[in-house]
Swiss-Prot record:
Pathway the protein takes part in: Amino-acid biosynthesis; L-cysteine biosynthesis; L-cysteine from L-serine: step 1/2
InterPro entries, sorted: Class_I_gatase-like, MetA_family
GO MF, one annotated term: serine O-acetyltransferase activity
Record key words, sorted: Acyltransferase, Amino-acid biosynthesis, Cysteine biosynthesis, Transferase
Gene Ontology biological-process entries: cysteine biosynthetic process from serine
The protein's Enzyme Commission number: 2.3.1.30
Name of this chain's protein: Serine O-acetyltransferase
Keyword Transferase attributed: yes
Record family assignment: Belongs to the MetA family.
PANTHER family xrefs: HOMOSERINE O-SUCCINYLTRANSFERASE
Gene Ontology annotations for the cellular component aspect, listed alphabetically: cytoplasm
Remaining remarks: Is able to complement an E.coli cysE mutant strain but not an E.coli metA mutant.
Amino acid sequence: MEKSPLKIGILNVMHDKADTKTRLQHVLTHTAIPVDLHFYYPMTHYAGRTVPEAVSSILDPLDIHEVATMDGFIITGSPIETLEFDQVHYIAEVRTLLKTLSQHVPNQLYLCWGGMVALNYFFGISKLILPHKLFGVYPQTILEPHPLLKGLKNDFKSPHARYAEMDVRGIHADPRLTINATTTKGKLFMVTEPTDTQTFVFSHIEYDRWGLDSEYKREVAAHPEIDYVRAKHYYHHKNDYDHPKFNWKKTQRTIFDNWIQHVADHRNDNH
């Protein structure tokens, strides 16, 4: 008997929600394993105001009861990592989601800010503001092998874009947590816990070729008075910003394909 498609939910709290949805649709449907994707927004983010049509036309309000039936769930990044978690006005809804995921959903993937808020909620790890934004494409070092990294070798490339980092000393001090990979300069790439239910990835591995470039342009447009630095190790030639590299494509494909296979191997019995 043919199995039903994997049910995968995504809380999309990125600034570029339409592009993020398109990117995740692309990377999550690359394998031959059929998937049924459900994209959500946090309802309390729009409390007291009308949900913009650009959001409501592509995302559904977060439904906790529906979430509990998912085979896998992803929380995306969000450009709010400089805020304390309690300053995020929809944090209570996110924490309710995290509690539901921990109780009912066997496969959880947390990306960038999603990884930060989840690592803090589940393990009490603190978030620290970096002196400068980590922004560019960097080689990674594999410290501990993991099924999601299968097929990747040391120095695999991945894009990073964040103003904050989780407390590495706190992670090392918690025997439940493993740092599987970092940049070659020690910035976090992937953290896991022993049950392999939760994976925390601090890179925007879902970004397409233009993701970092678009992020730079968004920040410049929002704050033209700030002298933002362009992404490092990203453009083919200095002062030629029309031809960015996409040298993390194998990283992206490998990790998402491995995760989809992991979800298929550990389905939710609560459908």
